[in-house]
Amino acid sequence: MNREHCYCVIMAGGTGVRFWPVSRAAKPKQFLDVADTGKTFIQSTYERFLKVVPKENILIVTGDRYHDIVMEQIPDLAPENLLLEPYSRNTAPCIAYATYTILKRDPQARVVVTPSDHMIDNAELFAETISNAFDYIEGNDILMTLGVVPTRPDTNYGYIQACGGSDVYKNDRPMKVKTFTEKPDRELAKVFISTGEFFWNSGIFLWKAENIRRTMEKYLPEVTRQFQGWENALGTSVENEFITRAYTDCRNISIDYGVMEKTDQSWMYPVKFGWGDIGTWESLYNIIPEKDRNGNAVSAEKTLIEDTSGVLVVSPEKKKLIAVKGLEDYMVIDTDDVLVICPKDDKKFKDFISGIGMPEFEKYR
């Protein structure tokens, strides 16, 4: 297909609270080099898609407070390709905003939608996979998501059950989706993996812009009606007023729950490249390849570790000696103004840090 009709939407609106205290409201994780690669998450994502989508067809959707950070980190981004959300309303409104914007430019648009915080370990294979998926949706009115063969019963990811029985892991062609399950508990995740029918849901989607518009109007009319007329407001003096009003009245809902779980157009493309959704400290620990013999992962200047296993130690400033003794499956996260010592289990951490919402901790958020 003609790549001039291929677009990419990078969703970069999250606040990254599960990566606190390194990720803060003023500069969340998508704008940080949490994985110590030399590039921020959003920079890596942008560069990854340059291999398959024309530069002028890459759009970024983020909170309006992050305008300057995005333009600083992605200076090649055309200003009109930065879509600013006045409020966070989850992925369905974000996708509606981008879809209506793209359709005004190009009614023939084919779109890949991606989060901004993924780790991919084979950029060439990734580009080939996206290109193949674009080719597949060209001849089919389907909504495609990329599925990843699970390597562990991870409770931080959603799961997709593919049609095709217990041999689906051998398949390298798109498959119709049977069920979606959002973040099961560990026991259920183990059952899923044992069946050989389930994949991790990568959260990367591909579709024709016109097809997702029609499907969202069918299943999420309360969202899409907020953006009707956007094509007339775009580029005019009422543009900001229109979007503020749309987001004020818009329902907070994900595209998975609002559309993908309901439509019979959901298909999954199994991928072979290495993938990680770095949404939590626990997920970062899981993808770090360099661990010591006791399973400790360290990103710090100097450490003294004894009688300790399965621990993640992170000190972004790398100015201190971090000494750890007698811990198991913990994380030690040290910044200039906050020190966190906590079990690295994501659910426990999320409950624990809810306390930073108290007024006396405002400056640390």
Locate each region found by the language model:
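Conserved N-terminal catalytic core of the sugar/cofactor nucleotidyltransferase
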Residues: 1-10, 17-25, 36-115, 121-131, ...
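Residue-level signal for inorganic ion chemistry
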Residues: 42, 98, 117, 160, ...
